[in-house]
Curated annotation (Swiss-Prot):
Its main location: Golgi. It holds the Pfam family Branch. Disulfide bonds join C59-C412, C100-C172, C151-C199, C372-C380. PANTHER family: BETA-1,3-GALACTOSYL-O-GLYCOSYL-GLYCOPROTEIN BETA-1,6-N-ACETYLGLUCOSAMINYLTRANSFERASE, GLYCOSYLTRANSFERASE 14 FAMILY MEMBER. The lineage of its organism: Eukaryota, Metazoa, Chordata, Craniata, Vertebrata. This is Beta-1,3-galactosyl-O-glycosyl-glycoprotein beta-1,6-N-acetylglucosaminyltransferase. Residues 1-9 are cytoplasmic. Keywords: Disulfide bond, Glycoprotein, Glycosyltransferase, Golgi apparatus, Membrane, Signal-anchor, Transferase, Transmembrane, Transmembrane helix. Its EC number is 2.4.1.102.
C-alpha cells in the first residue's frame, strides 16, 4: 500500500514535469557538450608521451630525421631489457575490456569530437585483421573518433582468443563492431574482397550518415590526423580516390585463368575463363580504397556489378583490379573517365602509401622513394628512420608497420599524431 502511494506521489502532475525537465536538461547538456568550443575542454591527459617504451628515445628528434637518435633506436632495440619487455596478449585484452570504462581511460581513447568540422563529417572504416591484437588496438585508437564507424573483420582462421579480444575491444564502443559474417581469408583469393564486402554491407546498414569508407588492414597506420583526413576527403567533393591504371600485360594471366583454393593456397587450374561481363576494360590497382557512400551503395545493389563480382571470384588477386575497374565505369558515383589521362597511380592516390622493394633507390636519381631495411613480400616495414620522409607524403595511411619489428616507429608516429590533433584545440 505504501509503495503504491509512493508511486502515486512520485508521478504526480508536478513531478512528471520535473522528470521531463530533467531529461530535457540532460539532452541539452549533451548536445551543447558536443558542439561547445573545444578550447574550453582540457584534453592534456590524452597525450601519449609517457607511453614511450624507453625514456632514452627522443621522438621529436626521430621525426626530424636525427641520425644519432635513429641509431640510438637501433641499439635500444637490441638490449635485453627491451627484448624482454612486457607485452599484452589476447587474454590481457579480454581481461582489460571486461571493464570498458577503465580500458578506455587507460588506453586514452578520444571520446568526444575534437571539432564541429570533424563531428559533421563521419567516416566509416573497414579493418581486416587476423593477428597481433596490440597492433589492432593501436590502429583503432589512432583513428578512433566517436562520430565515426568501425567494422573489424577477423579472419575465421584466427585464434579464438584473438577473436574474443577483438570482440572485447569492440564491445567497449557503440560505433565499433566485429563483422556479422567472417571469412577464412586465403592470400590473393576472393575471400580478401569478401571480407571488405561484409564490412561494407554492415556499415551501410548500420548508419546512413557517414560520408566516405576507407578500408584498412591490421598493419596500416595513419600518417594524418582525423581533421586532416576529413579535410582531404572534403576536397574530393564526392569523388572516390584509389589506384586505377592501365592493366599491364603480365597481370592478365591472373584473370584469364580459373583459380581454386587447394590445400589452403590459391592454385591456377589451367583452364581458361570467359571474358568479363563488362563493356569497360579491366584496370589495375590495389586492395586499398577511399570511396563515397554512394559508391558503396552502387556496388552493393547494382546487378551489373554483382555479375562482375561473381565472375571475378575464381581469379587471382581480384582485389588488385576489381575496385580499380569499378572506379572507371561511367555510371558509378564518383568514378573517373575511361581515358588514360585519368589513370591514377598508387603515388597519386591518397588511400595508402606503400614502399615496394623493387622501386626503392636514390631519390635524387629518380627513384620514387628511398631504400628500406626490412621487407615482407617485397613491401617495406617502416622503421623509425622512415618517419621523417613518410610524414611529407600526401597519403592518409601507410603500410606496413609492425610492433615486433620496430615498436619505436609506431610509438613516435602515434605520439606525434595525437599531439598534433590536440594542439589544434589550443586558443
Amino acid at each position: 500500500m505504501l509503495r503504491k502511494l509512493w508511486r502515486r506521489k512520485l508521478f504526480s502532475f508536478p513531478t512528471k514535469y520535473y522528470f521531463l525537465f530533467l531529461a530535457f536538461s540532460v539532452v541539452t547538456f549533451t548536445v551543447l557538450r558536443i558542439h561547445q568550443k573545444t578550447e574550453f575542454v582540457n584534453f592534456g591527459h590524452l597525450e601519449l608521451f609517457e607511453e614511450n617504451p624507453s625514456s632514452n628515445i627522443n621522438c621529436t628528434k626521430i621525426l626530424q630525421g636525427d641520425v644519432d637518435e635513429i641509431q640510438k633506436v637501433k641499439l635500444e632495440s637490441l638490449t635485453v631489457k627491451f627484448k624482454k619487455r612486457a607485452r599484452w596478449t589476447n587474454y590481457d585484452y579480454i581481461n582489460m575490456t571486461g571493464d570498458c570504462a577503465s580500458f578506455i581511460k587507460k588506453r586514452k581513447y578520444i571520446t568526444e569530437p575534437l571539432s564541429k568540422e570533424e563531428a559533421g563529417f563521419p567516416i566509416a572504416y573497414s579493418i581486416v585483421v587476423h593477428h597481433k591484437i596490440e597492433m589492432l588496438d593501436r590502429l583503432l585508437r589512432a583513428i578512433y573518433m566517436p562520430q565515426n564507424f568501425y567494422c573489424i573483420h577477423v579472419d575465421a582462421k584466427s585464434e579464438k582468443s584473438f577473436l574474443a579480444a577483438a570482440v572485447g575491444i569492440a564491445s567497449c564502443f557503440s560505433n565499433v563492431f566485429v563483422a556479422s559474417q567472417l571469412e577464412s581469408v586465403v592470400y590473393a583469393s576472393w575471400s580478401r574482397v569478401q571480407a571488405d564486402l561484409n564490412c561494407m554491407q554492415d556499415l551501410y546498414q548500420m548508419n546512413a550518415g557517414w560520408k566516405y569508407l576507407i578500408n584498412l588492414c591490421g598493419m596500416d597506420f595513419p600518417i594524418k590526423t582525423n581533421l586532416e583526413i576529413v579535410r582531404k576527403l572534403k576536397l574530393l567533393m564526392g569523388e572516390n580516390n584509389l589506384e586505377t591504371e592501365k592493366m599491364p600485360s603480365h597481370k592478365k594471366e591472373r584473370w584469364k585463368k580459373h583459380y581454386e583454393v587447394v590445400n589452403g593456397k590459391l592454385t591456377n587450374m589451367g583452364t581458361d575463363k570467359i571474358h568479363p561481363p563488362l563493356e569497360t576494360p579491366l584496370f589495375s590497382g590495389s586492395a586499398h580504397f577511399v570511396v563515397s557512400r554512394e559508391y558503396v551503395e552502387y556496388v552493393l545493389q547494382n546487378q551489373n556489378i554483382q555479375k562482375f563480382m561473381e565472375w571475378a571470384k575464381d581469379t587471382y588477386s581480384p582485389d588488385e583490379y576489381l575496385w580499380a575497374t569499378i572506379q572507371r565505369i561511367p555510371e558509378v558515383p564518383g568514378s573517373l573517365s575511361l581515358s588514360y589521362k585519368y589513370d591514377t597511380s598508387d603515388m597519386q592516390a591518397i588511400a595508402r602509401f606503400v614502399k615496394w622493394q623493387y622501386f626503392e633507390g636514390d631519390v635524387s636519381k629518380g627513384a620514387p622513394y628511398p631504400p628500406c631495411s626490412v621487407h615482407v613480400r617485397s613491401v617495406c616495414v617502416f622503421g623509425a628512420g622512415d618517419l621523417n620522409w613518410l610524414l611529407h607524403v600526401h597519403h592518409l595511411f601507410a603500410n606496413k608497420f609492425d610492433t615486433d619489428i620496430d615498436l619505436f616507429a609506431i610509438q613516435c608516429l602515434d605520439e606525434h599524431l595525437r599531439h598534433k590533433a590536440l594542439e589544434t584545440l589550443k586558443p
